Amino acid sequence: MDGPAEPQIPGLWDTYEDDISEISQKLPGEYFRYKGVPFPVGLYSLESISLAENTQDVRDDDIFIITYPKSGTTWMIEIICLILKEGDPSWIRSVPIWERAPWCETIVGAFSLPDQYSPRLMSSHLPIQIFTKAFFSSKAKVIYMGRNPRDVVVSLYHYSKIAGQLKDPGTPDQFLRDFLKGEVQFGSWFDHIKGWLRMKGKDNFLFITYEELQQDLQGSVERICGFLGRPLGKEALGSVVAHSTFSAMKANTMSNYTLLPPSLLDHRRGAFLRKGVCGDWKNHFTVAQSEAFDRAYRKQMRGMPTFPWDEDPEEDGSPDPEPSPEPEPKPSLEPNTSLEREPRPNSSPSPSPGQASETPHPRPS
């Protein structure tokens, strides 16, 4: 099966990159609300989100990757791009990730790009209540990737320190309070995952977790291939797995977001693909923060099915053979924070093959 064709319109993405550079100089680090959900000013607008919600431009062979921010978006994009090309890495090595899987809701979004070839691969962080309405009467497919929300908090906190469009996260305690109240970009993690899980059981919806990919990447890739109706032979499958490890993505300038201007993503202050691990929250949460999170989680997720991160919160998955080489020097949400972490048992995180995050705006998140 043929995957999407590479660059369709001469000069389109050159113009796009110019737009990004101009926009990135004007990011105020403030939020506006669309139907109650917070969005960063600059990369999003009322008009761009309304277009994503109300467009009729949905094709039956469209593939949507849906995540809450910092839940594995980059990883899933890389995997699906490789699947669509039957393991051939030339596409992921030559075309920026935001061009391969443009965002639905950014001001230069997937639905505003002309003449895209099928099948289209698109990304979104939108909660289900404002996602593209036309999808729900189509045969288009959604892959929703979840992640331990404790790891999401840590990753989003660090990302907020380098992303020009986001508010300064403040202290670790303040950021955790904001996260638990849904006062962060794209709103409540709890509402996001609970909303999308209403789709579970439908033929065009796949729910998979970061932790499942970490524990069994090859098996997870085979599951995704089955969902997409794109089975791969042994050699192609091995290539998908090999080229979607954390180290492979971190070394790929088309996937690690280092092509973005510092005003949008300041890599001098930290890497977008930071560690690529599961369980890193144990190196950052204080006991008090962990207890506060657990209380909110139990209340919000009562009646929901068990997730991989619920089975034993003190146990991590098996280690990845290619862990990130960069150790975190001080255990806290932020280095040198005044919040000292009390000792926790079994607090060593296990490396994972890839960390996602996120961007047709090359909005990494």
UniProtKB/Swiss-Prot annotation:
Effect listed in the UniProt record for changing residue 19 to A: Increases the cholesterol sulfotransferase activity
Presence of keyword Manganese: no
Temperature dependence: Optimum temperature is 37 degrees Celsius. Retains 70% and 20% of activity when incubated at 42 degrees Celsius for 45 and 120 minutes, respectively. Activity is lost after 200 minutes incubation at 42 degrees Celsius.
PTM statement from Swiss-Prot or TrEMBL: Phosphorylated.
Secretion signal, residue range per the UniProt entry: none
Catalytic activity entry: an alcohol + 3'-phosphoadenylyl sulfate = an alkyl sulfate + adenosine 3',5'-bisphosphate + H(+); 3beta-hydroxyandrost-5-en-17-one + 3'-phosphoadenylyl sulfate = dehydroepiandrosterone 3-sulfate + adenosine 3',5'-bisphosphate + H(+); (24S)-hydroxycholesterol + 3'-phosphoadenylyl sulfate = (24S)-hydroxycholesterol 3-sulfate + adenosine 3',5'-bisphosphate + H(+); cholesterol + 3'-phosphoadenylyl sulfate = cholesterol sulfate + adenosine 3',5'-bisphosphate + H(+)
Keywords (A to Z) from UniProt: Cytoplasm, Disease variant, Endoplasmic reticulum, Ichthyosis, Lipid metabolism, Microsome, Nucleus, Phosphoprotein, Steroid metabolism, Transferase
Phosphoserine PTM positions: 348
Positions of region (Disordered): 303-365
Binding-site positions, 3'-phosphoadenylyl sulfate: 70-75, 147, 155, 210, 244-249, 274-276
One cellular component term from this protein's GO annotations in UniProt: extracellular exosome
A GO term, aspect molecular function: steroid hormone binding
Domain comment (free text): The C-terminus, which contains a proline/serine-rich region is involved in nuclear translocation and enzymatic thermostability.
UniProt similarity note: Belongs to the sulfotransferase 1 family.
Functional note: Sulfotransferase that utilizes 3'-phospho-5'-adenylyl sulfate (PAPS) as sulfonate donor to catalyze the sulfate conjugation. Responsible for the sulfation of cholesterol. Catalyzes sulfation of the 3beta-hydroxyl groups of steroids, such as, pregnenolone and dehydroepiandrosterone (DHEA). Preferentially sulfonates cholesterol, while it also has significant activity with pregnenolone and DHEA. Plays a role in epidermal cholesterol metabolism and in the regulation of epidermal proliferation and differentiation.
Protein name in UniProt: Sulfotransferase 2B1
